[in-house]
Amino acid sequence: SHSTTNKKEWKKNLLKQVLRPFSKVYATNYMCCSELAGRWLFGDKAYDSGQVYLLNNAIDLDKFKYNESLRKKKRKELGISDDTLVIGHIGRFVAQKNHTFLIDIFNEVHKKNNNSILLLAGQGPLKEEIENKIKELKLNDSVRFLGQRSDVNELYQAFDVFCLPSLYEGLPVVGVEAQASGILCILSNTMTKETKVLDITKFMSLNNTPEEWADSILDDVKRYKRIDTSKEMTSKNFNIKEEAKKLEKYYLNLYNNGGEEK
């Protein structure tokens, strides 16, 4: 199970609700990538009784771990000085990602620290709308559109803060990647609490004003010293090399026991 529901997408929700019971008709074993998804698809009773195997959305930590020399190289490549505050976002330009609110947050950040920049990676149907908003706020020189990228793991190195004020999420992999890169993460509290793997992550309400989000970002970044978080991420079961071994063991166990978990 990767699925959850969102009240804003009623058509998708209806389809999911119709199909959900069929997920268990022929399944002999249940698996999920988060508690939220597991409970939604298989039910609280199945989850609480241990019938659902939880396997985290693990990543290749070696690709994402903090690297100071790569950070400097990437910033130089992007034409960003070492002392510039960089706020980053990775996601499609769709309503869910709440880019309009993100721009309002950055506008408040920039008022208080004009040596700041916002990097936006991704494509999507609302890109032009966001570009127009940036022009209206006269932030053209301080917001950059990076397009669809194949070097996302390196982009995280250039960030100081990862901001994700989504209207809704399940457990976003970008949140896991950002924490693996050792950067501060400011996320909306609309997503599952499991997204907070490390203490460098903070949830904020979308009811807070953009200025309150900005103040939180500026206060937190002053106090934070970036470190390599790969060991801690491994201990939290987000190292894909270790999780792959667990999955292999899980499958072998099923095979050796006729499909039953032992």
Residue ranges of predicted features:
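Membrane-interface segments of envelope glycosyltransferases acting on lipid-linked substrates or membrane lipids
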Residues: 1-262
